[in-house]
């Protein structure tokens, strides 16, 4: 008995719809719902769709906000540069310069990032006098000096810090120059000592060579002219010449 086609089929799919057998070929049935879609109700599917659309809208909104923020920042920078004249001088921070004791020049010395403090001649004189008395101020002294100068205590503190740094730098330069001169003097003295040592060694070697060439030391002529001997048997004085022979005998004798 031949099997009959009952139209039953088994398949798995997501959002693809069902398949129906029609003879030997399989054709897709768009009208039939997918097995996964049948598991959820229409209300749940609408919530999922709304959540997806909401997330996409938030991403687009955040992206547009970032672009607007970047555009606004660029506009603010360009506006500040245009207002400051192109060199950023109006946006510099007012701070105490390194040469505050000299009155300052009013122009930033650190690459155009800082502006030196303008000090009057009286303020500079008072600061220098105070520094010569006390190079480090206490809290009360700092506030009192700031009140006299009509400055902020922080400005006075920074001026003293810079003044101490300049003093230390100048002292270091003086010490360095002194040590440099000492080093040059010692180097010259070392060269002279080496030259003298070489001269002494040369003289010593020459003297040693001269002493080695003469094995015997000659006596003076006055000492070698005559040698007087006394004969113990006859008690006569015998004068011996340089050759060792008798040159003459004395006739005188010594009595005891």
UniProtKB/Swiss-Prot annotation:
Leucine-zipper: annotated segments: 170-214
GO cellular component: nucleus
Positions with biased composition (Gly residues): 102-112
PROSITE patterns xref list: HOMEOBOX_1, HOMEOBOX_2
Subcellular location(s) per record: Nucleus
Record-linked InterPro entries: HD, HD-ZIP_Homeobox_LZ_Class_II, Homeobox_CS, Homeodomain-like_sf, Leu_zip_homeo
Keyword Transcription: yes
Region listing for Disordered, in residue ranges: 52-117
Expressing tissues: Expressed in roots, leaf sheaths and blades and panicles.
UniProt main location, coarse: nucleus
Keywords: DNA-binding, Homeobox, Nucleus, Transcription, Transcription regulation
Coiled coil, from the record: none
Keyword Transferase part of the UniProt annotation: no
Role, per record: Probable transcription factor.
Protein family (similarity comment): Belongs to the HD-ZIP homeobox family. Class II subfamily.
Identification of the protein by name: Homeobox-leucine zipper protein HOX18
Gene: HOX18
């Amino acid at each position: 008995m031949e099997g009959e086609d009952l139209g039953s089929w088994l398949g798995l799919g997501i959002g693809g719809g069902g398949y129906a057998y029609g003879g030997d070929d399989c054709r897709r049935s768009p009208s039939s719902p997918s097995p996964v879609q049948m598991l959820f109700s229409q209300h749940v599917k609408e919530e999922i769709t709304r959540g997806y659309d909401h997330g996409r809208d938030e991403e687009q909104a955040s992206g547009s906000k970032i672009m607007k923020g970047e555009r606004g920042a660029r506009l603010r920078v360009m506006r500040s540069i245009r207002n400051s004249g192109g060199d950023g001088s109006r946006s510099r921070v007012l701070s105490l310069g390194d040469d505050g004791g000299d009155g300052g020049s009013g122009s930033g010395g650190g690459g155009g990032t800082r502006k030196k403090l303008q000090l009057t001649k009286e303020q500079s004189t008072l600061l220098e006098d105070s520094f010569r008395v006390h190079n480090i101020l206490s809290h009360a002294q700092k506030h009192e000096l700031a009140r006299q100068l009509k400055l902020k205590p922080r400005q006075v503190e920074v001026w003293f810090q810079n003044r101490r740094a300049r003093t230390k730098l100048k002292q270091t330069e003086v010490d360095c120059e002194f040590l440099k001169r000492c080093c040059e003097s010692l180097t010259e003295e070392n060269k002279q000592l080496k030259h003298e040592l070489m001269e002494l060694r040369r003289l010593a070697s020459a003297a040693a060579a001269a002493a080695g060439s003469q094995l015997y030391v000659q006596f003076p002529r006055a000492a070698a002219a005559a040698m007087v001997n006394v004969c113990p048997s006859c008690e006569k004085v015998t004068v011996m010449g340089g050759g060792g022979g008798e040159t003459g005998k004395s006739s005188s004798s010594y009595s005891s």
